[in-house]
């Protein structure tokens, strides 16, 4: 299928991107539940909203079309088939519990499109659900489970739109995510691509289906980078497994979407949960990396074996050398997150290596990582800062908070 959508590099002109603003889901974060919801602290939500709006504005100032997930989802559930598909997959006994499925579905179907979208992302607690509908069973659940019991869970990690789906050249993957706290997210993004008027019938799906059980095969977009010349980088990390990588590689080769998948074997650490937390591009021939992790990465490559399968070989040289050679570059400029060991670790924790490019040599970065941002500027990179005090509490920066939908290729 010919499609206008596609991401053909990490640094080409960014044309269209999906983000998800902070909202009701983040108001659900408490000191007692934030750990389970994969945040390290509660957010000052009003400030997070302000800072995210500023980020969107700065992207629009550079000519990027920014679409926001709450809005897309409200427009998706306005399509009757889209609403039905979401509710068929969300309002099920395994999520709601027997005895309340029909009641919850009836309640959700009665909401406005905007309220339904807000509820699907923000969650529905047992204490919000009307007693007149829930009856005695709801009362028993409230008494037994307390205020943190949800009929639909809040999804605060939708803030990090990079992970649930990722565009690889001319198509997209619908990713089975690692942590249970995020499993429902892919249902929502998939519904947008299936039913939203801007996307329906216009999207190539390479791999993944959120209605299936993928077992140990987990994939998150923060580990996936289509860097150009038919190459795809994938981090084998805390959250992306070899089982998923091998399946995706085989599918990309079968569909002619890629020629090589370079696997970065990483330690399984929260501080380095994805490849993009330790390694991102700043220009066509410049990368920013956290040396304490990246210098230890082993690189392997999948290629087609010519018989419909794949072959796997260990790459010679360092990870950066492997990337440089794959792009046909004579030299790769490397900027390391700066300072002594203490400063480097703090910078890493504050998503200092998590850049996203607006165009070659123009990046968005958190303001707090001043030392590293200065190093980038000395290398000739234009750094546009965004405020990270609240947005970074789930351990993600500009790269994590953006799902590019259209990005130009780069001439290597």
Curated annotation (Swiss-Prot):
Listed InterPro entries: Arg_deiminase
Entry's localization field: Cytoplasm
Q: Which pathway, metabolic or otherwise, does it act in?
A: Amino-acid degradation; L-arginine degradation via ADI pathway; carbamoyl phosphate from L-arginine: step 1/2
- Give the coiled coil ranges: none
Residue numbers annotated as active site = 400 (amidino-cysteine intermediate)
MF-aspect GO terms? arginine deiminase activity
Major location category of this protein = cytoplasm
In its UniProt entry, what is this protein called? Arginine deiminase
Q: Which organism is it from?
A: Mesorhizobium japonicum (strain LMG 29417 / CECT 9101 / MAFF 303099) (Mesorhizobium loti (strain MAFF 303099))
């Amino acid at each position: 299928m010919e499609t206008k959508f596609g991401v053909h590099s990490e640094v080409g002109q960014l044309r269209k991107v999906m983000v998800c603003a902070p909202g009701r889901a983040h108001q659900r974060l408490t000191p007692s539940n934030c750990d389970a919801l994969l945040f390290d602290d509660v957010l000052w939500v009003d400030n997070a909203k302000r800072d995210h709006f500023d980020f969107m504005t700065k992207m629009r100032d550079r000519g990027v079309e920014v679409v926001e997930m709450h809005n897309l989802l409200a427009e998706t559930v306005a399509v009757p088939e889209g609403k039905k598909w979401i509710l068929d997959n969300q309002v099920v006994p395994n999520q709601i519990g027997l005895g309340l499925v029909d009641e919850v579905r009836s309640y959700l179907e009665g909401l406005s499109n905007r309220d339904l979208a807000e509820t699907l992302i923000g969650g529905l607690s047992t204490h919000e659900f009307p007693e007149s509908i829930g009856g005695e069973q709801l009362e028993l659940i409230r008494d037994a489970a307390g205020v943190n019991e949800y009929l639909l869970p809040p999804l605060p990690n939708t803030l990090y739109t990079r992970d649930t789906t990722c565009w690889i050249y001319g198509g997209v993957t619908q990713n089975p995510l690692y942590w249970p706290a995020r499993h429902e997210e892919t249902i929502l993004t998939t519904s947008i691509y299936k039913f939203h008027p801007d996307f329906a019938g216009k999207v190539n799906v390479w791999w993944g289906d959120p209605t299936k059980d993928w077992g140990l095969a987990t994939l998150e977009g923060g580990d996936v980078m289509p860097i150009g010349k038919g190459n795809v980088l994938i981090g084998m990390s805390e959250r992306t497994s070899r089982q998923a990588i091998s399946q995706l590689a085989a599918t990309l080769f079968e569909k002619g979407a890629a020629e090589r998948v370079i696997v970065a074997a990483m330690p399984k650490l929260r501080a380095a949960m994805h490849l993009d937390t330790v390694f991102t591009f700043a220009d066509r021939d410049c990368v920013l990396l956290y040396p304490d992790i990246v210098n230890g990465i082993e690189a392997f490559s999948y290629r087609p074996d010519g018989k419909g399968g794949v072959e796997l070989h260990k790459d010679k040289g360092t990870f950066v050398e492997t990337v440089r050679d794959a792009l046909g570059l004579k030299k790769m400029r490397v900027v390391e997150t700066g300072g002594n060991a203490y400063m480097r670790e703090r910078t890493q924790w504050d998503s200092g290596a998590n850049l996203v490019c607006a165009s070659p040599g123009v990046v968005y970065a958190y303001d707090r990582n001043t030392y590293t941002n200065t190093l980038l500027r000395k290398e000739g990179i234009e750094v546009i800062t965004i405020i990270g005090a609240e947005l970074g509490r789930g351990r993600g920066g500009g790269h994590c908070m953006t799902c590019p939908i259209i990005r130009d290729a780069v001439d290597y």
